[in-house]
């Protein structure tokens, strides 16, 4: 089961809703997954389709227990590669359809026809509970979240730009930074930051999934920090080794051309210890000198040795 399916299954467990929350949630699900149908003799129907059985049960329960609307459930195979079941909740009784549309305000019913309402009704979404219920429904109907082991990405899909912007505004009223882009004929409201995805999971009540995401985030951050430390240490080690090789080459050149005895005593002592201990750090080299010298003093002497070698190299065209 995908992480996205786990989140939806968890959210659907919160099914003891007050009517105001249930209508906000149902309205958002219908907006993403619903279809208004017109039959013969101007009869109307409504369908809600989903591949998630938990969402089907939740919608069925709301329609039956809160709205007292009779429904039928059809099951068919998806046309997708995975061939999952598609659950279709069908409402054919015209009075039930009109009651549903009136309660959820997805479609305006007027004498001259039906008009889709692309706003998020303030009659439905007006306090913290109904706002969270609406966002929860929008996720159940048209949302998905990627496996956080791979990437951080959560999105809602809709076919209307005005509605996409309204939903993004609602989400962002909780301090998030969702954005809207167009993908072919759809509009995508998306969040890509791990921390903000955690915040949204908290808003919709997916607390177990939130903990799982946070554990993954912690492990990924730890791995990234370890990699940065290792890379930094590797770079420093490589730099140290290259410097030591360069110093030893300079000392050998001086010894060959003029002999180390020609060097001042402080540089000669430094050169002899470096030859004897090619692998030790500057700090350790300084501690071996008599009297001991600090790291900066060792570095200064080795630079002077390299400078002498460079001048000898120029003179001899080595």
Swiss-Prot record:
<dbReference type="GO" id="GO:0043937">
    <property type="term" value="P:regulation of sporulation"/>
</dbReference>
<dbReference type="Pfam" id="PF02650">
    <property type="entry name" value="HTH_WhiA"/>
</dbReference>
<dbReference type="InterPro" id="IPR004042">
    <property type="entry name" value="Intein_endonuc_central"/>
</dbReference>
<keyword id="KW-0132">Cell division</keyword>
<dbReference type="Pfam" id="PF10298">
    <property type="entry name" value="WhiA_N"/>
</dbReference>
<dbReference type="InterPro" id="IPR003802">
    <property type="entry name" value="Sporulation_regulator_WhiA"/>
</dbReference>
<dbReference type="InterPro" id="IPR023054">
    <property type="entry name" value="Sporulation_regulator_WhiA_C"/>
</dbReference>
<dbReference type="GO" id="GO:0003677">
    <property type="term" value="F:DNA binding"/>
</dbReference>
<feature type="DNA-binding region" description="H-T-H motif">
    <location>
        <begin position="281"/>
        <end position="314"/>
    </location>
</feature>
<keyword id="KW-0131">Cell cycle</keyword>
<dbReference type="GO" id="GO:0051301">
    <property type="term" value="P:cell division"/>
</dbReference>
<protein>
    <recommendedName>
        <fullName>Probable cell division protein WhiA</fullName>
    </recommendedName>
</protein>
<comment type="function">
    <text>Involved in cell division and chromosome segregation.</text>
</comment>
<comment type="similarity">
    <text>Belongs to the WhiA family.</text>
</comment>
<dbReference type="InterPro" id="IPR018478">
    <property type="entry name" value="Sporu_reg_WhiA_N_dom"/>
</dbReference>
<dbReference type="InterPro" id="IPR027434">
    <property type="entry name" value="Homing_endonucl"/>
</dbReference>
<dbReference type="GO" id="GO:0004519">
    <property type="term" value="F:endonuclease activity"/>
</dbReference>
<keyword id="KW-0238">DNA-binding</keyword>
<dbReference type="InterPro" id="IPR039518">
    <property type="entry name" value="WhiA_LAGLIDADG_dom"/>
</dbReference>
<dbReference type="Pfam" id="PF14527">
    <property type="entry name" value="LAGLIDADG_WhiA"/>
</dbReference>
């Amino acid at each position: 089961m995908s992480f996205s399916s786990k989140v939806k299954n968890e959210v659907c467990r919160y099914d003891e809703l007050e009517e105001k929350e249930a209508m906000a949630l149902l309205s958002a699900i219908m907006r993403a997954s619903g279809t208004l149908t017109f039959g013969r003799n101007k009869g109307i129907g409504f369908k809600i389709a989903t591949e998630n059985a938990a969402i089907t049960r939740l919608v069925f329960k709301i329609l039956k227990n809160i709205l007292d609307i009779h429904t039928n459930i059809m099951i068919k195979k998806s046309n997708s590669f995975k061939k999952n079941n598609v659950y279709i909740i069908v409402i054919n009784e015209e009075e039930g359809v009109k009651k549903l549309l009136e309660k959820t305000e997805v479609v305006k019913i007027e004498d001259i026809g039906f008009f889709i309402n692309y706003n998020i009704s303030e009659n439905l979404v007006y306090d913290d509970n109904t706002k969270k219920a609406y966002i929860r429904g929008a996720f159940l109907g048209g949302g998905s979240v990627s496996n956080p082991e791979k990437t951080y990405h959560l999105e809602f899909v809709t076919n209307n730009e005005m509605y996409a912007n309204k939903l993004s505004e609602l989400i962002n009223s909780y301090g998030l930074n969702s954005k809207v882009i167009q993908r072919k004929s759809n509009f995508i409201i998306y969040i890509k930051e791990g921390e903000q995805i955690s915040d949204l999971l908290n808003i919709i009540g997916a607390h177990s999934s939130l903990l799982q995401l946070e554990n993954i985030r912690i492990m990924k951050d730890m791995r990234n920090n370890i990699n940065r430390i290792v890379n930094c240490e590797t770079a420093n080690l490589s730099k140290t080794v290259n410097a030591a090789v360069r110093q030893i080459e300079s000392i050998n050149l001086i010894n060959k051309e003029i002999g180390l005895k020609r060097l001042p005593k402080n540089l000669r002592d430094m050169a002899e210890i470096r030859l004897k201990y090619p692998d030790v750090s500057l700090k350790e080299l300084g501690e071996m000198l008599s009297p001991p010298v600090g790291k900066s003093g060792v570095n200064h002497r080795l630079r002077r040795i390299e400078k002498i070698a460079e001048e000898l190299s120029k003179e001899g065209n080595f």
